[in-house]
A protein has these predicted regions:
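Catalytic adenosine-cofactor/nucleotide-binding cores of aminoacyl-tRNA synthetases and other
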Residues: 32, 43-174
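Divalent-metal (Mg2+/Mn2+/Ca2+)-assisted nucleotide/phosphate chemistry catalytic cores
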Residues: 1-53, 74
């Protein structure tokens, strides 16, 4: 930039190189920056990491990119935790296992009919060749259902622990 500060792209490439990043996973809206990043890597004589561009997460209608505003309009979270006025998934009662599972299925489909995955299963089964080419529609009913699949397998002790955490998070005492 004219003020002497490194631009985003320059800083991004240098930071990823210094941190020895081998794979970059980001949204398709960054696809247009790929040539600039590869050019910078080549200019410095560095091997670029592997780049994976995920499809956009679309509104529940399938039209347009999901945004923060959609949380207020449609009454469901779009962030992991509270962000300003909108409740996040955590405050809405989603488990880390359930929301991770649901988000992993947005834009990716493993082999077979399975829809419930643990983190370890996702790591084992993930193949970048299975990333969808088109945008993924955000379906809050499916997110609730997948979260339910995880909740029903939890022990009573874990359910009580989650309830305690929710009460603390919501500022309630029981």
């Amino acid at each position: 930039k004219s003020d002497g500060m490194p631009t985003y792209h320059f800083a991004n490439v240098v930071d990823d190189h210094d941190m020895k990043i081998t794979s970059v996973v980001r949204g398709e809206e960054w696809l247009s920056s790929l040539p600039s990043h590869v050019t910078l890597y080549n200019h410095f004589g560095w091997s670029p990491p592997k780049f994976y561009h995920l499809p956009l997460i679309l509104k529940s209608t399938g039209q347009g990119k999901l945004s923060k505003r959609d949380a207020e309009e449609q009454g469901h979270p779009v962030f992991a935790v509270q962000w300003e006025e909108s409740k996040g998934f955590k405050e809405s009662g989603y488990t880390p296992e359930g929301i991770l599972n649901y988000l992993a299925l947005l834009g990716w489909k493993g082999k077979g009919d399975d829809e419930k995955y643990s983190l370890n299963e996702l790591v084992k089964k993930f193949d970048s060749k299975d990333i969808n080419k088109s945008g993924a529609r955000f379906d809050i009913k499916k997110a609730v259902w997948i979260n339910h699949l995880h909740l029903r397998d939890f022990s009573s002790k874990k359910i009580l622990s989650l309830c305690d955490q929710a009460n603390v998070l919501l500022g309630k005492k029981i």
